Amino acid sequence: MRRICLDGNWSLIALSPEKNNYGIKDGSSFEINMPTSVQDALIEAMVVPDPYYAENELETMFIGKSDWSISRSFDLEIASGCRYVLHLEKVDTISSLILNGRQVASFDNEHRIYNVDVTEYLVSGLNDIEFRFTSSEKIASRRAEALEHAVPCSRYKYDSPNRNLVRKAQCNAAWDWGLCLQTMGIYESIELYECKDLYVSSFSAIPVRSATGDWKLDIKVYATAFADGGTTLAISCAGKELTVHVKYGAGDCVFVASMEIPAEDIKLWWPNGFGEQVLYDVEIAIAGFVLSRKIGFRTIEVRNNTTMGGKKLTVCVNGKPVFCKGANWIPLDARPGRMSMERYDSMICDMRDANMNMVRIWGGGW
């Protein structure tokens, strides 16, 4: 397996843009450092002002009403017998993928992960890749016009109508706490994978506690096979190792395995203020792919015991009732390009220091 990262400098081109005060016309070209949004690139290049200041929000809304192209070239030497899969996350939103002048795929859901087999579209040597973005507001309006009956949605003084007809972060179209910034772009690394028999996209690791107190770690590995075959799956966690042989047929497949871990080898994870937040690394290796993630070993249940006047709602962690204290998490920023891990870490540490132990993830963002 080989991973080729396509992050870095791309070209941003306006396609029939809406009327604006910044001289941006059809074919206007700029640099964009991917992954990021079109809005972030134009703001950082000082082509348009920061929408947070004064009434600049109104001055920059034309960006989300326009269409844009993001493209670059890259060298590749095709390896015999290999397949090539393009891995994409947080594609925002209505867009098409074009490789060497041929349309490969189209996307219309920001909340999905896409793994696109692009083998037949690549050549040895120089390859041209382009993402062509269509205004979500335009698409939403077309969908609204096609409906037999109108579907209402939240409206604000300055907003983008019909937000509920496009699968993207709803707050992009304005909210009571946020500005209207109908973003478009790609917000995670753009990765091309070279692989032979299998492409492994992800895995899950769920700890389950038995009545004796011992643990079972349930593993599911999600992959795509290009032909029938078999291979070895290796799993490690908490000093334990497990190796199993798995067989597969061509197409999407899921490999399932379980690892037994004695209770004495595990330190429990506790909410803030109740104990330590001990995390363990889980690593899997299969067909040249090595994936890892951190997990905490704990049980969580909601108890609805009958009490005077109704029922309780008590969250229990490791059998202990928890008095929940927390906050509602909205997106860190209206500009996706500024959502760094450092800012996430800082905010979460602030919540910890304020003695919070629960966070509700608001559903209208990322």
For the regions a protein language model found, what residue spans apply to each?
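Secreted/periplasmic carbohydrate-active enzymes, especially glycoside hydrolases
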Residues: 1-364
